[in-house]
Amino acid sequence: MAQAEVLNQESLAKQVLQETFGYQQFRPGQETIIETALEGRDCLVVMPTGGGKSLCYQVPALVMGGLTVVVSPLISLMKDQVDQLLANGVAAACLNSTQSREQQQEVMAGCRSGQVRLLYIAPERLMLDNFLEHLANWNLAMLAVDEAHCISQWGHDFRPEYAALGQLRQRMPQIPFMALTATADDTSRRDIVRLLGLNDPLIQVSSFDRPNIRYMLMEKFKPLDQLMRYVQDQRGKSGIIYCNSRSKVEDTAARLQSRGISAAAYHAGLENDVRAEVQEKFQRDDLQIVVATVAFGMGINKPNVRFVVHFDIPRNIESYYQETGRAGRDGLPAEAMLFYDPADMAWLRRCLEEKPAGPLQDIERHKLNAMGAFAEAQTCRRLVLLNYFGEGRQEPCGNCDICLDPPKQYDGLMDARKALSTIYRVNQRFGMGYVVEVLRGANNQRIREMGHDKLPVYGIGREQSHEHWVSVIRQLIHLGLVTQNIAQHSALQLTEAARPVLRGEVPLQLAVPRIVALKPKAMQKSFGGNYDRKLFAKLRKLRKAIADEENIPPYVVFNDATLIEMAEQSPLTAGEMLSVNGVGTRKLERFGKPFMALIRAHVDGDDE
């Protein structure tokens, strides 16, 4: 591609961003991905929920011309994306089983004529022979695969229908592919590249950090009472509560309803029309809280979810990260609350042991152990989360329960040296439970058979409890001094960073283990910019009225972050309105007048 053409496409991309989507600047990583896609090269995009993944294929789709096909796993997610694109004046459509034959034929005709620019479709529909024949006759410019982690068996959400997508590369060798996901570790990334046949792709891994989400943990004592108090403190904010079973979902929703809280149950066992009604009410702010199994969420693009509660601990950090990521997609402050009981972990471990032995079970065990370590962390929870995804960071976040109410610190160098020495002396071949038994001088047959009762480190930690040493080793893992080798049954192994600690050359502070977890405590940190709260409330009311009249979710009109910016800047002209993030040319034409009129009346004091 000629240099002049590349520069022209880059300037067109910025124009599309500003005029169509109403954003003044690209977010970190977006511009590189978009430029690469426009050059015709494959991309793998790993970007957190709310990080702007969709724009990575939507912008090039509008610059390139032709048709971009987007593979998406859920009908609700497709419909939501299409609604938002149509509100921005983009010719988008979807094909799914809920449409009539006439509707489907109309969409197909739009694709054939070049009228449709973005087509959303489920993987199983895309892979039908007759559809692939149609596709071969359309002006296909790019294929985007959303939720791409679903193709990997090592991922936390493997879907067999995604596996068939691997055949597409042979049929479309010249078409650029873009795979997108919010959660993929290194193994899953390699799997996605291999299975989709991505050719020398740009692999763009953005920071996994969601700084606006506060990570909190509450140990379960009287869980339902604690949950009721927590929800009542949220004062009408939108939230999702995840439970591990359908019966618990229904029981929890019923108890919330009995307290006068606007809540509904959602799980795969409910009728389709019931699920659709719950989802629609939630999207439209007619329902405050959805209590759900993990069946709920992937299809949710609601930006103003202010809290996500895990009433039961998830099976892995990937699921936890993805589910908590449904909070605060608008970039405004949000909270992720995990209710934790060690007995829940024990139950999940028992369930896991009932599965067939093999590599998949080993990986699930490793992931479950990592989730347990997160729950029992004595150090900044965000650091534990980011280090799990391979994003080394050492500065505490200041926005989690540990940072806001820090555990007591002590000189942990001696304990660290004892633990590291024991790991080293047992040849870095054993897991945490065994290492702790050697440290505490346990008298069991396995230790005697291995001859480890003769080691100088045997029993050097007997004065401390089992829980104490588990906490110490977990902290050493979180600090990057120890790793768990999943290929060797999570054997503990020292990193290069452990050497100076082992030699006693550097100081090391550890957290005094909280054998009893931190009791719930009010930790309300004030948030929010310098905006007019009264005007914001009026703007929200107007938005809801327009959304109901147009039969669309309120955030499709403007999201909360856009309304806050309006309440901050009080734009009175079209030019001022276009400088607000989230207001593009099409939305200004469609919704601008009533919002500017309301702001004018508020500024003049005419609406009091």
Where are these regions (language model features)?
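Accessory DNA-binding and partner-docking regions appended to nucleic-acid-acting proteins
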Residues: M1-A13, I363-R365, Q394-E608
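Flexible coil/turn residues that form the inter-helical turn or adjacent wing/linker of helix-turn-helix
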Residues: P173, R235, Q378, Q428, ...
